[in-house]
Swiss-Prot record:
GO MF terms held by the record: metal ion binding; peptide-methionine (R)-S-oxide reductase activity
Gene Ontology BP term (one): response to oxidative stress
Main subcellular localisation: cytoplasm
Annotated residues for binding of Zn(2+): C51, C54, C97, C100
Modified residues (N-acetylalanine): A2
Cofactor remark: Binds 1 zinc ion per subunit.
Protein name: Peptide methionine sulfoxide reductase B4
EC number: 1.8.4.12
Similarity-based family: Belongs to the MsrB Met sulfoxide reductase family.
Annotated ranges, domain MsrB: 12-133
Catalytic activity: L-methionyl-[protein] + [thioredoxin]-disulfide + H2O = L-methionyl-(R)-S-oxide-[protein] + [thioredoxin]-dithiol
Amino acid sequence: MADLVTVVKKTEEEWRAVLSPEQFRILRQKGTETPGTEEYDKFFEEGIFSCIGCKTPLYKSTTKFDAGCGWPAFFEGLPGAINRAPDPDGRRTEITCAVCDGHLGHVHKGEGYSTPTDERLCVNSVSINFNPAKPSSIT
C-alpha cells in the first residue's frame, strides 16, 4: 500500500506571497541556482533539511556529503519525501518535494561516490531549510 501524503496545493499568487523571488523561481519554475553561491553547499551541522515551500522534512544531515559540485548533495531522502521524474530532455531525473511538488534539483547515478546508494541528489540550497538536531534526535 502506498504512503498517504497530504498534498499542498497553492495558486501561483499564493506561492509568490510566501516565497522569495529566487525561491519561487527555483521551486515553482524549476530553476537552478548558481553553484557555490548559497549557504548549504559546505554546511555540515546535524539536523534535518526541510522543503522551504511546505516545511516537509526531506533529508537527514547524516545523508549529506561533499560532492564538490557547488550544491548540497545527499545520497538519499527520507522515505516518501522525494518524488523522481525524468526531465523532458531525457538526460536527467528531477527530484521534487512529494508534498508540494516543489523543484529541489536532480539525481545523478553512477558517479563513483563512496555512498551507500552511489547516487548524488543535487539540491538547490534555496529550496531547503535547515532545522538543527535536538540532542540524540539524529541517528
